Regions:
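Active-site phosphate/pyrophosphate-handling residues
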Residues: 95, 108, 154
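Structured helix-beta-strand junction loops
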Residues: 103-104, 136
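Generic structural signal for small/hydrophobic residues in well-ordered secondary structure
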Residues: 10-13, 54, 109, 140, ...
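N-terminal helical cap/lid subdomain that shapes the substrate entry/recognition surface
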Residues: 2-91, 95, 102-103, 114
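Anion (oxyanion) recognition and catalysis
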Residues: 101-102, 184
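Asp-based, Mg2+/Mn2+-dependent phosphohydrolase catalytic module
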Residues: 1-5, 114-115, 120-210
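Proline-centered loop/turn at the N-terminus of a beta-strand
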Residues: 106-108, 189
Length: 210
C-alpha cells in the first residue's frame, strides 16, 4: 500500500449524519407529494440533480418547486426543505479531521451537494462552535461548483489536480458504493463506511493518526 498523503471525505453520511427521511419530510411539507420517489441518499436525479450539478441556479430550482407544488415557494422554503437532510454533526468526525491535518495530511471535501445545503454548512452554524465547514478542510470540491457529480470521473480528476495528489497516495472516504467503485477504477485508495457509521475508529484511520 502506498503512503497516504491526501484524504478526501464525502459530506452527507460521512462528515455529517444524514437523514433521508428528514429530507423527504421537508419536501413533502413544502408540497412535493412524490418526494420519496424523487430524492435519494447518495445521488439525486431530475431537477434535484440539475441543482447539485450546477446546471440550474437556486432561483431556477425555486421556480421548478413552484411549478411542482402549484403554489408560491420561497428560497427560504427550499433552504428549510433541504436542511431536513441534516441529522447532526458528530463532533468526533470534526476532531479527527483536524487531527489528520495536524499530522500533515492534505484533507479535502468531495461532495455531491447544492447551494442551499452549503449556505448552512459554510456558515458559523455548522459545528455549533462558530466554525463553518471550510474551517475543517484545506479545500472543498462541491458538485454544484465543479459542474459535475460523483461518480463521474471528472470530479475525481478535479480533486486530484487541485490537491496536487497522486491517486495511489489518496484515500477517499465515502458511504456510496458507486462512488467508491469509480475511485478504485482511478487507482484511488478507498474506505467505505456504512451511512452514518463511525469511521473514526476504523483501523485505517487510526493508523494514520499514530
Amino acid at each position: 500500500m502506498n503512503e497516504i498523503k491526501n484524504i478526501a471525505f464525502d459530506l452527507g453520511g460521512v462528515v455529517l449524519a444524514l437523514s433521508l427521511e428528514g429530507g423527504i419530510r421537508g419536501f413533502e411539507k413544502m408540497g412535493v407529494s412524490d418526494a420519496r420517489q424523487r430524492l435519494d441518499a447518495f445521488v439525486q436525479k431530475g431537477v434535484f440533480a440539475d441543482l447539485e450539478s450546477g446546471r440550474i441556479s437556486m432561483e431556477e430550482f425555486r421556480l421548478e418547486m413552484c411549478r411542482l407544488t402549484n403554489k408560491e415557494i420561497t428560497l427560504q422554503d427550499c433552504y428549510e426543505a433541504w436542511h431536513g437532510y441534516v441529522d447532526y454533526v458528530p463532533q468526533q468526525n470534526l476532531a479527527t479531521i483536524l487531527r489528520l491535518r495536524e499530522k500533515g495530511f492534505k484533507v479535502c471535501l468531495l461532495s455531491n451537494t447544492n447551494p442551499f445545503m452549503n449556505m448552512w454548512a459554510d456558515s458559523p452554524e455548522f459545528d455549533g462552535q462558530g466554525h463553518p465547514i471550510s474551517y475543517y478542510f484545506d479545500k472543498m470540491y462541491l458538485s454544484y461548483e465543479c459542474g459535475v457529480m460523483k461518480p463521474a470521473p471528472e470530479i475525481f480528476h478535479m480533486m486530484l489536480e487541485g490537491q496536487k495528489a497522486k491517486p495511489e497516495e489518496t484515500l477517499f472516504v465515502d458511504d456510496g458504493e458507486v462512488n467508491i467503485k469509480m475511485a478504485q477504477q482511478l487507482g484511488i485508495q478507498t474506505l467505505c463506511p456504512h451511512n452514518n457509521e463511525d469511521w473514526t475508529i476504523f483501523p485505517e484511520i487510526q493508523k494514520l493518526l499514530k
